[in-house]
Amino acid sequence: MKLSLKIIVFTVVCTFPLLTNAGTYLDLQKALVFKEHKQYGKAFPLLLQLAEKEFVRAQMEVADMYAEGFGFLKNNDEAIYWACRADQSGDYRALKFRIKLALKTTSDSYQPKQCSQVFK
């Protein structure tokens, strides 16, 4: 009896994190499908919610939507902010994305902030 109770508790403790992440992963996939089908009004709230929970892919997608103006006016400052938040994760894709975004948004009239300036 004690052994079966321990097994049940162990199973619940080990699978709970997987189950909670499963919902967020599905939300991310749903948001990406909305974005792919240009349903930005449905995609953005899902992506923003995940981005605020430190999902790197969602942070990069939010930055991309701000940079491209998908669903609203372009906002380079917000795009750089979210790219910097993604870069803080240490993910090399996020670093590469942030650098490309900074190069893409740089012009005579706009110089993107460094990440150290963004979080002051």
Regions found by a protein language model. Name each.
Residues 1-8:
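Bacterial N-terminal signal peptides that target proteins for export
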Residues 17-19:
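N-terminal signal peptide c-region/cleavage motif recognized by signal peptidases
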Residues 23, 34, 38-39, 52-55, ...:
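Short helix-capping/linker turns of helical repeat alpha-solenoids
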Residues 95-120:
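Terminal, low-structured helical/coil segments at or just beyond the last alpha-helical repeat
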